[in-house]
UniProtKB/Swiss-Prot annotation:
Binding-site residues, (S)-2,3,4,5-tetrahydrodipicolinate: 160, 169-170
Binding residues for NAD(+): 12-17, 38, 102-104, 126-129
EC identifiers of the protein: 1.17.1.8
Protein name, as recorded: 4-hydroxy-tetrahydrodipicolinate reductase
Species per Swiss-Prot/TrEMBL record: Salmonella gallinarum (strain 287/91 / NCTC 13346)
Pathway: Amino-acid biosynthesis; L-lysine biosynthesis via DAP pathway; (S)-tetrahydrodipicolinate from L-aspartate: step 4/4
GO cellular component: cytosol
Gene: dapB
GO MF annotation terms: 4-hydroxy-tetrahydrodipicolinate reductase; NAD binding; NADP binding; oxidoreductase activity, acting on CH or CH2 groups, NAD or NADP as acceptor
Reactions catalysed, as given in the entry: (S)-2,3,4,5-tetrahydrodipicolinate + NAD(+) + H2O = (2S,4S)-4-hydroxy-2,3,4,5-tetrahydrodipicolinate + NADH + H(+); (S)-2,3,4,5-tetrahydrodipicolinate + NADP(+) + H2O = (2S,4S)-4-hydroxy-2,3,4,5-tetrahydrodipicolinate + NADPH + H(+)
Amino acid sequence: MHEAQIRVAIAGAGGRMGRQLIQAAMAMEGVQLGAALEREGSSLLGSDAGELAGVGKSGVIVQSSLEAVKDDFDVFIDFTRPEGTLTHLAFCRQHGKGMVIGTTGFDDAGKQAIREASQEIAIVFAANFSVGVNVMLKLLEKAAKVMGDYSDIEIIEAHHRHKVDAPSGTALAMGEAIAGALDKNLKDCAVYSREGYTGERVPGTIGFATVRAGDIVGEHTAMFADIGERVEITHKASSRMTFANGALRSALWLKTKKNGLFDMRDVLGLDVL
């Protein structure tokens, strides 16, 4: 990797998250914006990435070819869609580039491809790059160990109208954190929809509810409900910049890593809590 600064390439440069990542990369000390990518045929190709993100000229031109910019970055940051991310993953694996992956909605085969690639390159793969969300995941583990065996657990998440996967990756990570603390597999205890005559709630399950509306950046609540009381642990994001800063922080953290699969809790050192 480049010794002076970590050079990053950003996928989906013209999207909501891509623009935030460009802004964060241009503002963060120790980070250099090396490349910005968009899909082939995009009207944004040839634009200056900084101007596209509204922060002034950067000198980095939006391109569609990873091959053309392979010498301009050390870490590839991807918050796009699974099919595109897996294509980028194969390229980064071939060329020894680190990756920060914030894409959600992978199937089991996609997740396995990421695990296999991490044997050769360093990857931070997280459902959410917010510091607050990752602190929340740790709190959920602790709450589950105390209340999980006797309370009803429900996870409610809300996002903007354009989000294409449900439940959100963060909601699933919350469920996995809770299930893991209870020595369960989320696949065996998750309930993702309720409609019509459902009968009484099955003890030991983890329910999910999804809201898609307006421009909600992201809201997540885990409820531990018993008779007479309930505990709710909530995180609300008001700006995507919190995710962008977390992703750039992860890229900096990867500078000393040659290979391995990590998540945001590794970056933040939350295992000590």
